[in-house]
C-alpha cells in the first residue's frame, strides 16, 4: 500500500509540474502580440540564416541572408516565397502549410492545452502538433518558456529545422511589411 501511495504521489507531482509548465507557456503566448528574431534554418543539412517578424494572428515576414535574397511573407491568408534576385515568386494558401499552426495563437494554445510536452536534452520542451493535415514540432526553453524553434517538412518532404535567437517581444512594427510582394 505505501508503494501505491508513493507512485500516485510521484505521478501527481509530474502532472502538476507539466501543468504549471504548460500554463507558463500559454501565459507567455497570450501576452505576445508579435515577436522578432534571428534564425538559422537547416534544410537537408544546408544552413541558411536571416531574421523574421511574426505578428499574431497569422502574419510573418522573413528575410534570408543568402545569395538569392529570399523573403517569406504572409498576410494572414496567403504565404509568398520570393527570390528577390530572380523575381521568382511562389504563393501558397497559408492554411495548407505547417506555419498556420505556429502563426495562429488560438490553434497553438488549444493544442498545447491538451498535449503533454516531451523533454529534450533536459533543456527544451517539445510539443508535436497535428492540424490541417500537417505536423509541426515546436520547441520552448525549459527554464524561460520562450519559443526557441520548430521542425517541420516542406512540400517536398524535406526536413526543415528552424532555431531562433535574439528574440524581442511586442516591438512596434510597420504592418506594411506583411503586404504580399507583387510580381516583377
Name each model feature, range by range.
Residues 27-47:
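A short, Trp-centered hydrophobic/proline-enriched beta-strand micro-motif
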Residues 85-124, 129:
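Flexible, surface-exposed loop/linker segments and immediately adjacent secondary-structure boundaries
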